[in-house]
Design a protein with these regions (language model features):
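Catalytic cores of nucleotide-sugar-dependent glycosyltransferases that transfer UDP/GDP/TDP-activated
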Residues: 1-228
Length: 228
C-alpha cells in the first residue's frame, strides 16, 4: 500500500518534538508502515527522523519561526485560515498531485485544519488516523480510544441516538520500547508521565502518593496550578 502522511506546519518530525503527541504519531506511524513494507511519503518540514520513501518539505523552518512568533510549538493554533497553515496545506496539495495514485491513502493528523487537503482530492481516501482532538470532519476516522470516540459522538450528535459510523475504528497509541527501557534494579518511587493538566489524573496520582507516604516523580509538559 501507499501512504501519504501529512504532518503539522509548526513542528519537525524528530524526537526533539516528542511533546507534540500528533507529531510523534506521525513519526511512529511512518516507522510502522515502512517496517511492514509499505510505501510512505511524508509531507512535513525540513528535519525528519522517520524512515520514509520521500520527505516532501511543505514549510521551511524559517517560516515556522515567523509563524510561532516566539511561542513554544505546543502553543501553536490549529487554524487553517492562518498564513502558515495556508502555506503548508497549499504546498501539500500541490505536491500530492505529483505523487498520488488511484488507491493511495491520504493520512491526516490535523483534523479540520487539514480539511482543505481532503477536499482537494475527493476521489481519494483521506483518513484521520490519530483522532485525539475534537475537530473531526472525515468519513474515515481512527480514534485513540473508545472513550474519546464516544465523547466525539456525543459532541456532534444526539448522544441518545448515536449509532456510530461503519468506517470508524479505534487503534490505541503506539510506542517505541527502547524509549522505556527495563530497569531491573528498581527504586522506590511512583512515576507519572503525561501532560500536567488535571484531566490527565495528576491530582489522583499526587493524592494517592501523599496518603501512602510515597515518592512521586512527574514528567511532562505544562504546569498545573494544583501541583504541590
Amino acid at each position: 500500500m501507499r501512504f501519504h502522511v501529512i504532518s503539522l506546519p509548526h513542528t519537525q518530525t524528530t524526537k526533539e518534538y516528542v511533546n507534540c503527541a500528533y507529531t510523534e504519531k506521525v513519526r511512529r506511524f511512518c516507522m510502522m508502515m515502512k517496517g511492514l513494507g509499505h510505501t510512505v511519503y511524508l509531507y512535513a518540514s525540513e528535519d525528519n527522523e522517520a524512515p520514509v520513501d520521500e520527505l516532501i518539505t511543505c514549510i521551511t523552518k524559517e517560516q515556522q519561526v515567523q509563524a510561532l512568533d516566539g511561542k513554544h510549538f505546543t502553543e501553536a493554533a490549529f487554524d487553517n485560515t492562518l498564513p502558515h497553515w495556508k502555506i503548508f496545506n497549499g504546498n501539500a496539495i500541490i505536491e500530492l498531485n505529483k505523487r498520488l495514485e488511484k488507491k493511495d491513502f491520504i493520512c491526516l493528523i490535523g483534523g479540520a485544519s487539514q480539511e482543505p487537503i481532503a477536499k482537494a482530492y475527493p476521489n481519494h481516501i483521506s483518513v484521520e488516523f490519530g483522532v485525539g482532538y475534537g475537530g473531526v470532519f472525515s468519513k474515515f476516522k481512527v480514534f485513540e480510544s473508545y472513550a474519546w470516540m464516544h465523547s466525539i459522538y456525543a459532541m456532534f450528535k444526539n448522544p441518545t441516538m448515536v449509532d456510530g459510523s461503519f468506517y470508524d475504528a479505534v487503534i490505541p497509541g503506539y510506542l517505541e520500547p527502547e524509549m522505556f527501557p527495563l530497569q531491573e534494579k528498581k527504586e522506590d518511587y511512583y512515576l507519572y508521565v503525561g501532560r500536567m493538566v488535571d484531566r490527565k489524573g495528576i491530582g489522583i496520582a499526587q493524592h494517592v502518593c501523599q496518603e501512602m507516604g510515597l515518592k512521586l516523580i512527574m514528567a511532562g509538559p505544562g504546569k498545573d496550578p494544583k501541583i504541590e
